[in-house]
């Protein structure tokens, strides 16, 4: 799950391996040289698991574990071959039993391994009978994984400096097979009975509550956990640790507990309260009780992603769950709430109802991302999360505007391709098209559809079309319910709304959004009362690629200078015309950025909107202002709007005070000078940075150095002061230096307002003494927010030796956890002094990085893009192409590689076309900035 990092932090600072898959090959060779009887990445459809009995015994001293898997299976046709998943497991013995009876043979089953497919074949002497129940018993052993997936080792240091070891699991998408032999595909659901053998000083937790503990030997306890509901293998979880916990009950009697290392359990209260509130919300919203007796949330010291939705035992990075009242930031509170909300939404979307295969991952992730906003808007209204939603859509559009993007629902087969699906298209675009559909249907109608979907498919698996079919019959026809929104609109037609009811064809409409990559650009041309609309596929660098000819069913919304009530129009064709009741001065489409499309206003349309922002910007909402800023710069990229007009539009920001338009402007403007940094254009680069400071100076000067205000006001303060200090704005730098001196003199004990800490630390890190002091404080800090603030600050150093040392240390993982490495590499990749070091480190350590973080993972994508996607010279482009093409099956075909190459090509083209125009624009007098 993507973490919520402030936008400015990031800026200041595919196919996969050639898995053997040729159906023409009669048989593959197993690792012992014998013929392997199955040549498909997917498991046979004729074998179904019913129930697993798992016994796991981990030794946290030798970092090994032993296991016994007993899995009940049924074959739909006679077969003597059982194909299962197994990866890095040493199978010592496999036997077969019919039903609950005796062994069929004293002779163990023959075991063949085919590591390239992560499969084993168990060969029975006699064919299994169709429709009969059998039990496969497998004994095996393995090392605890040194990566972040499978059954892996994690460590932490106590306040006294003692190193402690624990073992945790991360199975999604394809790593359950690293902990026990299994049928590791999401549609092969089964129930699980889990037993864990452990040392008496440790605690074991799993998906279900503990039933009993048995002393099986001196110094060895076996914990028996209750049988699970029917679920996919990737949702199984267990942890062996010395964690402490705090608990509360929901109104419906579900026990909610937060687990953490003993020194940090006092930071668990906020997440616990949020989890209880959110679980109660979801039970009510979905009208389906949470089906398990408990929900644990565990903070794992080493964790690659943000969090994981294992049923009944959700796992998190410490920074995604633990909240320190004294030191955690406003953005941390927002982030924790959203991530907990996301994982708890999965208990229904993903766990109760699961996609049939990973090509429809978005049914899990898009829904959970969308439900974050639906739930937290209600449960924590003070966070105002609805303001941040459209930012997710812009994130998705960044990658979805490239030719290398993919449809929301797209075929995948091997593990690396599956891992690549965990991207902004599955999460953010998935959420945005659901939000657009909700806006189209109305909140109540949409809710009826998804409740119907969840109830119909509970404990089952679904495809894309199953969701749309559930949305087809959602308007009540018997008059028993008050009709709202879409359903009431469907009863009468309107001359300005093409949403009148022939038949609600949600499926046809939504297939245009899930089965095609990209998104539409809508061009609006106003002529008197006539509004001409045209749609086309928005794609950067489209002149290099053939026309796609895609058409979408676009639910357009608009307001005008004459009416602020939202008007609606469903555009199904390439062009159409709507007629307004009267002529207008301006028209603004995509109200609130609820639609996943961008808009170009032809003729004098942009001039009218630019004038509106200049004269009376609060006439339209802050989200509408932010979307205008975004759309203007997106249009510059495809030469529909000049860079001068886009920059002119931003001049109104002198009077802006709201977080989202300012963040969106920074999102557009900061990358422009980052591209200049890579071309050694110091004079214009400096002028551009000065322009940005002048634009925001009044608002920067108004910021108090306190923690007062709403969450959005506090987040804005933190980012503006950081920007001012990093850009060397002296009033900010001098105050930050004073704070840092006092904080350092107190040996880090003095309390600094949380919202200004980032700016203070960034200034303090600019000399050797300050940098070293910050690093020493990092080692002893128990606060995730403070550690991330120090990490960021250390990465802003202009000393190449410090930056190189930081790369080496974070990769080793002794003091700075290796989980932080992708973020540190990216921050140094954004540093004007550090970016060559980051790019060099990525190349020299590629094989180790892939081993640790896995090919196709979002961490690998984050590092590839973070070190290269702001390059803007042909020399760097050739370097990038040369390096990745040399990798062959170890990364050359990754989607993130295609994305970064496209992005660099776009950067070069953009700079060649716009740099001189920017230089001249900066030289012109701007009365707005005086």
UniProtKB/Swiss-Prot annotation:
<dbReference type="InterPro" id="IPR027268">
    <property type="entry name" value="Peptidase_M4/M1_CTD_sf"/>
</dbReference>
<keyword id="KW-0391">Immunity</keyword>
<dbReference type="GO" id="GO:0006508">
    <property type="term" value="P:proteolysis"/>
</dbReference>
<feature type="disulfide bond">
    <location>
        <begin position="393"/>
        <end position="432"/>
    </location>
</feature>
<dbReference type="GO" id="GO:0045766">
    <property type="term" value="P:positive regulation of angiogenesis"/>
</dbReference>
<dbReference type="InterPro" id="IPR034016">
    <property type="entry name" value="M1_APN-typ"/>
</dbReference>
<dbReference type="GO" id="GO:0006509">
    <property type="term" value="P:membrane protein ectodomain proteolysis"/>
</dbReference>
<dbReference type="InterPro" id="IPR024571">
    <property type="entry name" value="ERAP1-like_C_dom"/>
</dbReference>
<keyword id="KW-0645">Protease</keyword>
<feature type="glycosylation site" description="N-linked (GlcNAc...) asparagine">
    <location>
        <position position="403"/>
    </location>
</feature>
<comment type="similarity">
    <text>Belongs to the peptidase M1 family.</text>
</comment>
<feature type="binding site">
    <location>
        <position position="342"/>
    </location>
    <ligand>
        <name>Zn(2+)</name>
    </ligand>
</feature>
<dbReference type="Pfam" id="PF11838">
    <property type="entry name" value="ERAP1_C"/>
</dbReference>
<keyword id="KW-1015">Disulfide bond</keyword>
<feature type="glycosylation site" description="N-linked (GlcNAc...) asparagine">
    <location>
        <position position="143"/>
    </location>
</feature>
<feature type="binding site">
    <location>
        <begin position="306"/>
        <end position="310"/>
    </location>
    <ligand>
        <name>substrate</name>
    </ligand>
</feature>
<protein>
    <recommendedName>
        <fullName>Endoplasmic reticulum aminopeptidase 1</fullName>
        <ecNumber>3.4.11.-</ecNumber>
    </recommendedName>
</protein>
<dbReference type="GO" id="GO:0005789">
    <property type="term" value="C:endoplasmic reticulum membrane"/>
</dbReference>
<dbReference type="GO" id="GO:0008235">
    <property type="term" value="F:metalloexopeptidase activity"/>
</dbReference>
<feature type="transmembrane region" description="Helical; Signal-anchor for type II membrane protein">
    <location>
        <begin position="3"/>
        <end position="23"/>
    </location>
</feature>
<keyword id="KW-0325">Glycoprotein</keyword>
<dbReference type="InterPro" id="IPR014782">
    <property type="entry name" value="Peptidase_M1_dom"/>
</dbReference>
<comment type="function">
    <text>Aminopeptidase that plays a central role in peptide trimming, a step required for the generation of most HLA class I-binding peptides. Peptide trimming is essential to customize longer precursor peptides to fit them to the correct length required for presentation on MHC class I molecules. Strongly prefers substrates 9-16 residues long. Rapidly degrades 13-mer to a 9-mer and then stops. Preferentially hydrolyzes the residue Leu and peptides with a hydrophobic C-terminus, while it has weak activity toward peptides with charged C-terminus. May play a role in the inactivation of peptide hormones.</text>
</comment>
<dbReference type="InterPro" id="IPR042097">
    <property type="entry name" value="Aminopeptidase_N-like_N_sf"/>
</dbReference>
<feature type="topological domain" description="Lumenal">
    <location>
        <begin position="24"/>
        <end position="930"/>
    </location>
</feature>
<feature type="active site">
    <location>
        <position position="343"/>
    </location>
</feature>
<feature type="binding site">
    <location>
        <position position="172"/>
    </location>
    <ligand>
        <name>substrate</name>
    </ligand>
</feature>
<keyword id="KW-1064">Adaptive immunity</keyword>
<feature type="glycosylation site" description="N-linked (GlcNAc...) asparagine">
    <location>
        <position position="59"/>
    </location>
</feature>
<dbReference type="InterPro" id="IPR050344">
    <property type="entry name" value="Peptidase_M1_aminopeptidases"/>
</dbReference>
<keyword id="KW-0482">Metalloprotease</keyword>
<dbReference type="GO" id="GO:0005138">
    <property type="term" value="F:interleukin-6 receptor binding"/>
</dbReference>
<dbReference type="Pfam" id="PF01433">
    <property type="entry name" value="Peptidase_M1"/>
</dbReference>
<dbReference type="GO" id="GO:0008270">
    <property type="term" value="F:zinc ion binding"/>
</dbReference>
<dbReference type="Pfam" id="PF17900">
    <property type="entry name" value="Peptidase_M1_N"/>
</dbReference>
<feature type="glycosylation site" description="N-linked (GlcNAc...) asparagine">
    <location>
        <position position="749"/>
    </location>
</feature>
<dbReference type="GO" id="GO:0008233">
    <property type="term" value="F:peptidase activity"/>
</dbReference>
<keyword id="KW-0862">Zinc</keyword>
<keyword id="KW-0479">Metal-binding</keyword>
<keyword id="KW-0256">Endoplasmic reticulum</keyword>
<feature type="site" description="Transition state stabilizer">
    <location>
        <position position="427"/>
    </location>
</feature>
<dbReference type="InterPro" id="IPR001930">
    <property type="entry name" value="Peptidase_M1"/>
</dbReference>
């Amino acid at each position: 799950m993507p973490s919520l990092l402030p936008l400015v932090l990031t800026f200041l600072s595919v196919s996969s391996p050639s898995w053997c898959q040729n159906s023409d090959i009669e048989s593959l060779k197993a690792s012992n040289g014998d013929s392997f009887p199955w040549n498909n990445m997917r498991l046979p459809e004729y074998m179904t698991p019913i129930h697993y009995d798992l016994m796991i015994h981990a030794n946290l001293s030798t970092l090994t574990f032993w296991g016994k898997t007993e899995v009940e299976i049924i074959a739909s046709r006679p077969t003597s071959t059982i194909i299962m998943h197994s990866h890095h497991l040493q199978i010592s013995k496999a036997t077969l039993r019919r039903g609950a009876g005796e062994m069929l043979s004293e002779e163990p089953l023959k075991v063949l391994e085919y590591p390239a497919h992560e499969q084993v074949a168990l060969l029975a002497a006699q064919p299994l009978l169709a429709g009969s129940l059998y039990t496969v018993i497998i004994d095996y052993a393995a090392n605890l994984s040194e990566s972040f997936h499978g059954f892996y080792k994690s460590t932490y240091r106590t306040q006294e400096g003692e190193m402690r070891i624990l073992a945790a699991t991360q199975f999604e998408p394809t790593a359950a097979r690293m902990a026990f032999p299994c049928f590791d595909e999401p549609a092969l659901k089964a129930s699980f009975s889990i037993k864990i053998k452990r040392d008496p000083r440790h605690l074991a937790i799993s998906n279900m509550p503990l039933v009993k503990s048995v002393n099986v030997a001196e110094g060895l306890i076996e914990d028996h956990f209750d049988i699970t509901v029917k679920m996919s293998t990737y949702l199984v979880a267990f942890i062996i640790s010395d964690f402490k916990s705090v608990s509360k009950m929901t109104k419906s009697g579900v026990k909610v507990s937060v687990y953490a290392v003993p020194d940090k359990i006092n930071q668990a209260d906020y997440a616990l309260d949020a989890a209880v509130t959110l679980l109660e919300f979801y039970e009510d919203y979905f009208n389906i009780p949470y089906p398990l007796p408990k929900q644990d949330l565990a903070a794992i010291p080493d964790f690659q992603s943000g969090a994981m939705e294992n049923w009944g035992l959700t796992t998190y990075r410490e920074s995604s769950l633990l909240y320190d009242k004294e030191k955690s930031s406003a953005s941390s509170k927002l982030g924790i709430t959203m991530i907990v909300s996301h994982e708890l939404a999965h208990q229904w979307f993903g766990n109760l109802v699961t996609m049939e295969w990973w090509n429809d991952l978005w049914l899990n992730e898009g829904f959970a991302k969308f439900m974050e906003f639906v739930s937290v808007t209600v449960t924590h209204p003070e966070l105002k999360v609805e303001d941040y939603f459209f930012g997710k859509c812009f994130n998705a559009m960044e990658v979805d505007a490239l030719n290398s993007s993919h449809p929301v629902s797209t075929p995948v087969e091997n593990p690396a391709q599956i891992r690549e699906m965990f991207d902004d298209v599955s999460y953010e675009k998935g959420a945005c098209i659901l939000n657009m559909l909700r806006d189209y249907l109305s909140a109540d109608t949409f809710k009826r559809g998804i409740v119907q979907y969840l109830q119909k498919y509970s404990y089952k698996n679904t495809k894309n079309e199953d969701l749309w079919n559930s949305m087809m019959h959602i308007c009540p026809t018997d008059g028993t319910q008050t009709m709202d929104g879409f359903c009431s609109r469907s009863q009468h037609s309107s001359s300005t709304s093409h949403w009148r009811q022939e038949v609600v064809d949600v499926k046809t409409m939504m297939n245009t959004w899930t089965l095609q990559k990209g998104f539409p650009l809508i061009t609006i041309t106003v002529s008197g009362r006539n509004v001409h609309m045209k749609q086309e596929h928005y794609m950067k660098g489209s002149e290099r690629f053939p026309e796609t000819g895609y058409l979408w069913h676009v639910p357009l919304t608009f307001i005008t200078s004459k009416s602020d009530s939202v008007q609606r129009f469903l555009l199904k064709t390439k062009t159409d015309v709507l007629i307004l009741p009267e002529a207008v001065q301006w028209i603004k489409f995509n109200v609130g950025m609820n639609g996943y499309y961008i808009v170009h206003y032809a003729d004098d349309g942009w001039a009218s909107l630019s004038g509106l922002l200049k004269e009376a910007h609060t006439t339209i909402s802050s989200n509408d202002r932010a979307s205008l800023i975004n759309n203007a710069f997106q249009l510059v990229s495809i030469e529909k709007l000049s860079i001068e007009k886009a920059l002119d539009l931003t001049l109104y920001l002198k009077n802006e005070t709201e977080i989202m338009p300012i963040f969106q402007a920074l999102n557009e403007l900061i990358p422009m000078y980052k591209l200049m940094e890579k071309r050694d254009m110091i004079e214009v680069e400096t002028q551009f940075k000065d322009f940005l400071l002048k634009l925001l100076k009044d608002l920067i000067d108004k910021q108090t150095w306190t923690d007062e205000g709403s969450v959005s006001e506090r987040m804005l303060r933190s980012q503006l002061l950081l920007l001012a200090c990093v850009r060397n704005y002296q009033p900010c730098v001098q105050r930050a230096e004073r704070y840092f001196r006092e904080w350092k003199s107190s040996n880090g004990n003095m309390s600094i307002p949380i919202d200004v800490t980032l700016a203070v630390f960034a200034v303090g890190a600019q000399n050797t003494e300050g940098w070293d002091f910050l690093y020493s404080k990092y080692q002893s800090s128990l606060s995730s927010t403070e550690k991330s603030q120090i990490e960021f600050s250390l990465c802003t150093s202009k000393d190449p030796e410090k930056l190189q040392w930081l790369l080496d240390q974070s990769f080793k993982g002794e003091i700075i956890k290796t989980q932080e490495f992708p973020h540190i590499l990216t921050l140094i990749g954004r540093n004007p002094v550090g970016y060559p070091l980051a790019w060099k480190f990525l190349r020299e350590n590629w094989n180790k990085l892939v081993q640790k973080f896995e090919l196709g993972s979002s961490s690998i994508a984050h590092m590839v893009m973070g070190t290269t996607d702001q390059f803007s010279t042909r020399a760097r482009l050739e370097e990038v192409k040369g390096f990745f093409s040399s990798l062959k099956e170890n990364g050359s075909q990754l989607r993130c590689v295609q994305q970064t190459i496209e992005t660099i090509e776009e950067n070069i083209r953009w700079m060649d076309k716009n740099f001189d125009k920017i230089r001249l624009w900066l030289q012109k007098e701007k009365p707005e900035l005086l």
